[in-house]
Amino acid sequence: MRERDPIAGPAWTRIVALLGALVLAPCCNSSRAAECTITVGVVLELTGPAGDYGQAAAKAVEMAFRDLNAAGGVRGCRIVTNTKDSQSQSTVAVDAANQLVQLGKVPVIIGGVLSSVTIPMLTAVTGPAKVLQISPGASSPKLTALGREGKTNGMFFRTITSDALQGSVAAKYALDRGMHRIAVIYVNNDYGVDLYDEFARTYKGLGGVIVSATRYNEKQSSYASEVTAAMAAAADGLYLISTPVDGSTIARAWISMGGPRRFLLNDGMNSADFIQGVGAKYLSEAYGTSSGTSPTVSTASFEQEYKAFARMDPGSPAADRAYDAAAIVGLAIAAATRAEPAAIRAALFTVTDPKGTVIHIGEDEFAKALALIRNGKPIRYEGVIGPVSFDAYGDITGPFRLWRITDGAVTTVGEMSVDEVNALVTRLGR
């Protein structure tokens, strides 16, 4: 099946419209807000292998700021965005972040979705410049390590859980599904390497056998050589750590070369594009793991509103977490003593205070939140993914979702709590 060109046709038209919409954020009713704006930088993967993720995330950011502006704006101003496409490439992302920080003087950047894009932005630009960065999708454990080492200057946060735990969840899920001997093909970047390492430690500790582990480089027209290497020994299934476009190519090669049609998939493969690219009939034994949610009133509201607003699936990877990232940023700007990075960072904890008044998503809830903030009261943002609480390194905790592909659709079949995962890791002496 021919791969879709991510920078041609209707998809590119959507991206152009998206960029325009993000700059022209809706105006609130406040006359003062109509006179001033506060710009938030956004660097997302609108094209390239993760283009579907980035587009879904960008629309969610736009929706969150629409709701905040409709609620009266922050600090008497509208929030607008300066949005740039990283093209799913680290070098492009670094250049974009540099422009936003050095020329745009933005106090905060939302992005990226991929760890391989997010980490270079952090280490080369936002960390040294002490500009706040919040990612809705970068799950590499390396980001926690950078925080511990002081290399983030305390300016990095994310609304997704670390793969340090997801790898362990995937290992147990694979064994529970009868994959005792597994081949692994994983993307050769920070995300893929870190997730594989965490998976391998737990999987082997539980008695599983990794018959082959093969890295691949992105955006190749064929992965026949990688698949051949992965099939060097008999396996019960394939753990494929990839993105929908490359993952489709690899899975098709695996199937055509006679590999067992049993798959374990990472969170980014929770995608209709992947299912369509491979063919649902070949994926009846495809299982996956993702960061889960703790459903709140906000969850149901988002699913309804996002579909109408974005004309996209609210289950798209990064959409829910991007809305929460943007909402938290906007509320923190409102609560900050000034619209500067350090002040906004401090205010992140004011708007996610476990002792604060609970606030859900949407115009009415944000209006209530802004009134409380003006009166010096803390709030507890309970977003689309549930209550959000950051630790000293900008990490959050949350459950993990277990899913499978059934009749061409992703279906949730279970969950592992953080306590269950930690107990597993402790049992293995890690």
Residue map of PLM features:
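Bacterial N-terminal signal peptides
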Residues: 14-26
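Bacterial N-terminal signal peptides that target proteins for export
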Residues: 2-17
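Extracytosolic ligand-binding ectodomains
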Residues: 2, 18-19, 30-430
